[in-house]
Amino acid sequence: MVVEANKKELICSFCSKKQHEVKKLIAGPAVFICDECINLCMDIMEEESKIALKQITYTIPTPQKICSVLNDYVVGQEQAKKVLAVAVYNHYKRLEYVQSGNNDVELNKSNILLIGPTGSGKTLLAQTLAKILDVPFTMADATSLTEAGYVGEDVENILLRLLQAAEFNVAKAQKGIIYIDEVDKIARKSENPSITRDVSGEGVQQALLKIMEGTVASVPPQGGRKHPQQDFVQLDTSNILFICGGAFMGIDSIITSRTNNSSIGFAANVNIDKEKINREILKSLEIEDLTKFGLIPEFIGRLPIVTTLDDLDKEALVTILTKPKNAIVKQFKKQFELDEAELIVEDSALEAIAEKALAKKTGARGLRSIIEHLLLDSMYKVAELKKQRVTITEDVVKGLIEPIITSIITPTAKTSKKQAAVEDIPA
């Protein structure tokens, strides 16, 4: 019933607003609710209905479809894309199976380890997978993590960031993807167990074990150590997919020493491609090589799927600059277009940019910073560049000249005829 105005002024039991502050106040047994709280409840229920409907109609893309979308964003790495597509498809099929209530066969979770040089596309692969599947995604740097109780970041903070990516929707977060970069940097310092505490190496591996395997973690919504009295969010990590990545510099030497396949003979022949040799060596990777590198057996056991990424050559880097949907050159061209200017990057300049990235050994990651540096002055004066064309040549990349700025001529009908007549006059 609606509370009469002549009675003692009452308040909403949910938002504490007084009767005169709202349009309606509905009474129940010893409680009251205002029209604003009713509308809020209806909005929440409507949103949950949309999520439920989306879950019902959602279909997992096939490995071929996943790989096809990856091809739109990631250049090369065909084997890695195939492995990831199959692994991710099987992971989310497993989730469907678990949610259906079937338990005749227990399907284990298969987390993934990506091994590849800096700038080879490990992070981009993980990000693109999350985008394809429309699931929450977060990244963490393993080098910033420490065991609980030490200065640094708790592993629970990774789960907090995933919750934030899911807008604190626990059910959604529990189906997300977590990418942990630079796991090679948390390798223990010695192959033999140490009597001293290794809080940023083996200690972090131990801390990651439980959440990677599957546990109900207590996640502090405000970040943990600074707010010890806060309520915790319970998050089940059993169905969260963990993808770990690292460069693992030097692991090729460990593989070579195990297989007694010395590269000295190869090095003597200058015609042999060293990168090709390294690719072949990495194909022989075994669990014992990762153990010798410094990962503990229990941690390796949580990462049953291991795949390697190749070094990117000049041709691949040029393709990355121009072909993908989010290609760097396309992005900069669009930025200039928004300011009514035009950007031209010559083919020879693209090759020079790729060569520069190879020389710096930054892979695809270094391409953007090179172009940012080349275009800094032009972008700084972009307001003056309306109806202007900025051209980047090979000499510009090499630092010999500044970017070439010319006018964009948009002739009228009359001037077009005059220009055509002039062009017809023989030189």
UniProtKB/Swiss-Prot annotation:
SMART domains for the chain: AAA, ClpB_D2-small, zf-C4_ClpX
Family label: Belongs to the ClpX chaperone family.
GO biological process: cell division; proteolysis involved in protein catabolic process
Binding site for ATP: 117-124
HAMAP family named among the record's database cross-references: ClpX
GO CC terms, sorted: HslUV protease complex
Keywords carried by this UniProt record: ATP-binding, Chaperone, Metal-binding, Nucleotide-binding, Zinc
Oligomer and partners: Component of the ClpX-ClpP complex. Forms a hexameric ring that, in the presence of ATP, binds to fourteen ClpP subunits assembled into a disk-like structure with a central cavity, resembling the structure of eukaryotic proteasomes.
PROSITE patterns linked: CLPX_ZB
Domain ClpX-type ZB, residue spans: 1-53
Binding sites annotated in the UniProt record for Zn(2+): 12, 15, 34, 37
Matching Pfam families: AAA_2, ClpB_D2-small, zf-C4_ClpX
Stated name of the protein: ATP-dependent Clp protease ATP-binding subunit ClpX
Gene: clpX
GO molecular-function terms, A-Z: ATP binding; ATP hydrolysis activity; ATP-dependent protein folding chaperone; protein dimerization activity; unfolded protein binding; zinc ion binding
Biological function: ATP-dependent specificity component of the Clp protease. It directs the protease to specific substrates. Can perform chaperone functions in the absence of ClpP.
